Amino acid sequence: MMKRSNEGIGGENYASSPSDDGQQKRRKIQFEPVRMPAVSNVNDIRARAVVYQTSKLKQQLLYKNKRIAELEKENERSKRRQQTDESNFLKVYNMFSDIEKYICTQTKNEFGEYIGGDTAPTGIDVLGMTNETYNKFFDQAKQNLRNAFVSYAKARHDRAHESTIFIDKLKTLIDSPTFNPNGVHKELTAKAASLAIQNEKLQSEVTKVQSDCYNLERKKRILTDKLSVQENRVQELEHQLEDARFETDKHMRLANKFEYKLATLVSEGQSGGNGGATPSSSGTTNATEKKISAPDIPPSETAAKEIENLRLERDEQESIASRRLQDLEEMNKKVQTLTQENSKLRLETQTFFSVDSIVNSEEYKNLKKYYSLAIKEYERVSKDLEDITTERDAFRSAKEARAMLMSEEHQKTLKEIQCQSDIHNSFYKVSHDSEVLRCEFETVKEEYNKTVKQSEWDEMKATLNTLRSMNRSLKSEKIRLREKDKQSQKDINTLKSELTSLKEAQDKCLLVPLEDVSNAPPEDVNKIRQEYESLCKEVKRLGAMEKQEKQKQVENLQKEVNRQIADKLSELETLRKTNEMLTNDEECISDELEAIGTAVEEEQERNAQLYIEKREQEDRNLKMMNDRMIQNQTFNRLREKLSCLESKAQTDAQIAKMHEFEKKANEELVTKLSESVQFKSAELTRLTNLMEQHRKNIQEVGMSRDENQIKADRCEGQMKQIQELYAAKAREIEDFKFKRQRAEEELETLRIKYERVKRNESVPAQSGDQVLEEANRQMKETLTCPSCKTRPKDCIMLKCYHLFCETCIKTMYDTRQRKCPKCNSNFGANDFHRIFI
């Protein structure tokens, strides 16, 4: 909320009141003076207030019409922006469809045919679609792209599966007795050639993808820097735009007000020119009333000067607004040029010693190829050697493990035969014990059924359920009566609080005297005093009538409250009596329930003992049955194991014969593999020498690259320092230009105001009628609210003793602008009070 100067209503200053009105200082916030006509009663005041409210509403309507036109322009701009967004979306959608087509063609070229899903629409078809159909086709396009990726991955997986099948096939061929090494070597060479071609393709793709990824990351960094700069700029422009909107809104409201005033003054001038001047009476009071109330008098020189001043102010505000818009456009252009230059400098520094130039050089590519080939050959030879050694060790370990297993299984069979004989003996003993226990269980069960009957238990349960339901109903009724008692006490407390609040409101009513009007001739002062005394008498009479009515209302309220309190007290006594009766009944019922509960608990204890004995007997029988089941299962398992051991003995004899044959084949393979290992070791030494040479070359290239990187970092640091200095200087220059421009504008406005003050001083002194009219106007302005200018003063601030209307203060309090418009002091709910002037 803006701070207001300590000024009176209509422009009078309480601190210092200079004699000349023309030499007054310009106020920070100036209430617009309203010329009110003569008033005979309160209804006339309200009628005039309605007239001024309609004028304010017309001004608001003009403002809203202009805002609607501006919003329509913004709507057109947003439509254009939406069209550009749709075109960008079309580009992205087509790019995704191109990716899908590329993946499909790759899968067809490498792995065969590709079975795709439903085709998604093109980007041109998507533009005219509704929201539902667009969502369906968008999901279809996503599914097609996902299917393309899945098919490509599946094809890769199938190829890897084929290679594993081929390796398994080789192993089976080597294990078979009819082993032909020439055929295996041919298949291996063919497979190695196909795998080498695939590896070359994959390596080229990997290098290409790595270079693309590096370029994309570099572009991403550049774009992120640009984005951060643009975001900062957008935030600054948003703040500037908000300030500009606030200024334009304020100027629009002023322009609407001035246009409405101009239109009203022109209409009054035309009506005055058409109708003749009315004759003035001899009395000064009648003349002033006619001047104020007559609408067909032509406008005076002061009104014409005010219109000219308003027009000049409007032109000044328009010129200032146009200048500031031009400044904003120039600043936007400067910022765009600076961002472009910054991005160019950044790109130049990054591309001067770029990694792409090193990576794309022929020497680097040749070194990379030789290095990759040497590493592949080294890995292949080392893998072959490891496979041969692992196979040899596996054969030896398998042979030893089989011999150990055969000896262990022979010992296990002997142990199992002994266990079977022991289990047979224990089984016969357990069966005899189970029959004895079953007979005992049947006898106990018959005795228990004779002692206890089911009908007695049912009767006991029914009586317990009825007693529980009665207890619940009594408790619910007790809770309901307590709630009723609490509600009656709350009503009594609320009525007492209302009584106290009404008494306090009656005591807080105040009357505030008004100050006398100074600096006026004695005849006018006497007349004004007579009018003032008559007005005060009427106000006192009205206040006394309202006080009597209020006292009558308060007495009636007290009677009603006392009557309600008596009714509530009688209800409370009846409720207390009923509560006592219910508590006595509840105690009797609880005693009966306790006696019944003890009897029920004794019966339950007896039943629990009988149940425990029954469960123990059942547990014994179950244990006997479980033991019998376990014995049957062990017999079946032993029979199965005997059959398995017989079959294993036959298979072990056959396996021993196979091992002798495999031993001979493995010895031949070991001799061949030892020869191949010697040849591969010679090749490996040669390749290691080549690798060391290439490694030295790569280290030299890396050192040169690091030096270039250090130089580039140093250049970037220098460039950033220069940019920061440039930005700081540019900001200082812009601030200085802005301050200078604002100072020039303020000087120009002060010059215009000084000329206007000189012109007003040259005007001759006003006539006696105008002086009296001005005094009458000031008197009426003292009685009107300075905030809304329409309603009379009927409320006072208890902190600062400033007067306003009650509606304005309530609106300020409700909108949380809880500060006095004159002295800017805070106020609360109890800091303002209604008065009668």
Curated annotation (Swiss-Prot):
Subcellular compartments: Nucleus
Keywords, ordered alphabetically: Chromatin regulator, Coiled coil, Metal-binding, Nucleus, Transferase, Ubl conjugation pathway, Zinc, Zinc-finger
Gene3D superfamilies reported in the protein's UniProt record: Zinc/RING finger domain, C3HC4 (zinc finger)
Pathway annotation: Protein modification; protein ubiquitination
A GO MF term: ubiquitin protein ligase activity
Domain of life of the organism encoding this protein: Eukaryota
Positions of RING-type zinc fingers: 785-824
Reaction(s) catalysed by this chain's protein: S-ubiquitinyl-[E2 ubiquitin-conjugating enzyme]-L-cysteine + [acceptor protein]-L-lysine = [E2 ubiquitin-conjugating enzyme]-L-cysteine + N(6)-ubiquitinyl-[acceptor protein]-L-lysine
Biological process (GO), any one: chromatin organization
One Pfam match: zf-C3HC4
Biased composition (Polar residues): 277-287
Tissue-specificity statement: In adult animals, expressed in oocytes, germ cells, pharyngeal and intestinal cells.
Enzyme Commission numbers on file: 2.3.2.27
Region of interest (Interaction with ubc-1), residue spans: 1-313
Coiled-coil segments on the chain, per record: 54-89, 185-253, 300-397, 458-651, 677-763
Chain intervals for the UniProt region annotation (Disordered): 1-33, 269-302
UniProt note: phenotype after gene disruption: Worms arrest their development at L1 stage, and show tail abnormalities. RNAi-mediated knockdown on a glp-1 mutant background causes significant overproliferation of germline cells.
GO CC terms in record: HULC complex; membrane; nucleus
Function: E3 ubiquitin-protein ligase that mediates monoubiquitination of 'Lys-117' of histone H2B. H2B 'Lys-117' ubiquitination gives a specific tag for epigenetic transcriptional activation and is also prerequisite for histone H3 'Lys-4' and 'Lys-79' methylation. Involved in regulating stem cell proliferative fate.
Similarity comment text for this entry: Belongs to the BRE1 family.
Oligomeric form and interacting partners: Interacts with ubc-1. Interacts with mrg-1.
Protein name stated in the entry: E3 ubiquitin-protein ligase bre-1
Species, as recorded: Caenorhabditis elegans
